[in-house]
């Protein structure tokens, strides 16, 4: 293609690999790939390459895996590729200003939210957690701040009542490459129009933790149901019964008012396990005891009915 760019790609997980795959079929010239060092994984703690490294090596691309881009000798790895632009997608390393300034057109990032909403580490999960009606991807020019650069292109998608972080991740992994290819075309032909982020509209997507995912029955049923979807597939909402963690995969909201204390089991039937919350009733539909597969409430009651006696309270 006449407006082909020399591109350095930097990314690590599957989400990033999908963007690299799109670049490789776009007609641009990917001159090098940066990804995180191989990490121990699995029971044997065997060193495993990132999905981006696997794809890059399949395609015969040069792969670089520095632990940091702060040392000058590692920055030379970038400079020596003489790229027009560096595309960064879930890379996991900070790019110093010297690196940001190296490519002719700078560095651009694909971020999984409609900036300036949800800057930070967990934008997909936080959009669900907060009950947002939509989310999307933003392609932005990178600067030294955390997701603070000028916006180049946005694509939105609705959040449905059935979406989990897993399903939303897949939606954005389809949208992101579309936005990226469009943005690169605009950069190549000089039609990109950077837009500053409105600082008054900024929200921050804090990292998730396993402790945050513990169900707090004082919250409303609607909030808890959103948390269950937001924390799926990681870290998974959970409750504790008899000292054992039990993951919750699916629940529904019953708007009925209840005078019972939050955490009180109101009913346990094949239709679900109904628990009082700070507002409304949460109906648990699919659960996973430690060491077991996820199962319906009915199947769990068949083996552990003593866990869910109406009138008892869950911690």
Curated annotation (Swiss-Prot):
Question: So what EC number does this one have?
Answer: 2.1.2.9
The reaction(s) this protein catalyses: L-methionyl-tRNA(fMet) + (6R)-10-formyltetrahydrofolate = N-formyl-L-methionyl-tRNA(fMet) + (6S)-5,6,7,8-tetrahydrofolate + H(+)
The residues the record assigns to binding (6S)-5,6,7,8-tetrahydrofolate are 113-116
Q: Name one GO cellular component term.
A: cytosol
What SUPFAM superfamilies would the database entry show?
Answer: FMT C-terminal domain-like (SSF50486), Formyltransferase (SSF53328)
The segment annotated N-terminal domain runs over: 2-189
Molecular functions (GO terms): methionyl-tRNA formyltransferase activity
Location of the region described as C-terminal domain in the Swiss-Prot/TrEMBL record: 210-315
Family annotation (Gene3D superfamilies): Formyl transferase, C-terminal domain, Formyl transferase, N-terminal domain
Keywords attached to this Swiss-Prot or TrEMBL record, sorted alphabetically, are: Protein biosynthesis, Transferase
Query: Biological process GO terms, please?
Result: conversion of methionyl-tRNA to N-formyl-methionyl-tRNA
| Entries under Pfam families matching the protein | Formyl_trans_C, Formyl_trans_N
InterPro entries documented for this protein: Fmt (IPR005794), Formyl_trans_C (IPR005793), Formyl_trans_C_sf (IPR037022), Formyl_transf_N (IPR002376), Formyl_transf_N_sf (IPR036477), Formyl_transferase-like_C_sf (IPR011034), GART_AS (IPR001555), Met-tRNA-FMT_C (IPR044135)
Family designation:
Belongs to the Fmt family.
Q: What does this protein do?
A: Attaches a formyl group to the free amino group of methionyl-tRNA(fMet). The formyl group appears to play a dual role in the initiator identity of N-formylmethionyl-tRNA by promoting its recognition by IF2 and preventing the misappropriation of this tRNA by the elongation apparatus.
Instruction: Give the domain section of the comments.
Output: Composed of an N- and a C-terminal domain. The N-terminal domain carries the tetrahydrofolate (THF)-binding site and the C-terminal domain is presumably involved in positioning the Met-tRNA substrate for the formylation reaction.
This protein is called Methionyl-tRNA formyltransferase
